[in-house]
């Protein structure tokens, strides 16, 4: 409704990663202070157990168009030609996934190290859901192939080690940076209500 009906704002790529992972990737970054002038314990979760995969989200009336738990966490990737979803169940198991979305090559990383914000009442005691990243595997016009080996993400050509932020931290390609794709981490019910045409990755 209004003069700008049909327009869409440009999405800026972002990630959900732990503070340790953020600090390692961006040591000089500014961090918002917890001293906001309001009493708030940012380490507590008022919705303990909300993201239990066997739960049903409150206020959801629609049935999901896919045979998937509404509370399953998914990585949603959208291009102009295709919308695709990847469940955490699969990405945590595989750690690295190469695929195409709308004809564009992507690589998904999933590593341990970030606690769920909606599991335990005290967030630092919550289960480790891990952090994700979705990137273009093309670097300087060369298509790299990645694997999870020895607890690290490496590219097969040079053996360089890559972080969850898509930066090479060691090896011949050290300090090289992959381009982040537009994606997000969502509950399945939240993503699929807006994008019911999503093709779910099943390999």
What function would you assign to each model-found segment?
Residues 1-203:
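Mid-to-C-terminal functional-domain signal that highlights helix-capping/loop sites
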């Amino acid at each position: 409704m209004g003069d700008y009906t049909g327009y869409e704002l440009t999405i800026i790529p972002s990630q959900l990663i732990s503070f340790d992972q953020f600090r390692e990737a961006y040591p000089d970054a500014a961090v918002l202070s917890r001293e906001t002038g309001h009493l708030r314990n940012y380490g507590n979760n008022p919705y303990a157990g909300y993201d239990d995969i066997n739960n049903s989200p409150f206020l959801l009336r629609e049935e999901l168009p896919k045979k998937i738990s509404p509370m399953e966490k998914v990585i949603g990737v959208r291009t102009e030609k295709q919308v695709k979803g990847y469940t955490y169940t699969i990405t945590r198991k595989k750690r690295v996934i190469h695929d195409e979305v709308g004809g564009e090559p992507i690589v998904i990383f999933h590593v341990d190290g970030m606690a769920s914000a909606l599991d335990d009442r005290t967030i630092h005691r919550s289960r480790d859901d891990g952090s994700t990243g979705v990137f273009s595997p093309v670097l300087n016009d060369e298509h790299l192939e990645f694997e999870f080996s020895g607890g690290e993400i490496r590219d097969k050509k040079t053996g360089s080690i890559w972080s969850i932020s898509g930066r090479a931290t060691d090896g011949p390609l050290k300090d090289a940076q992959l381009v982040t794709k537009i994606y997000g981490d969502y509950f399945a019910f939240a993503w699929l209500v807006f994008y019911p045409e999503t093709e779910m990755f099943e390999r």
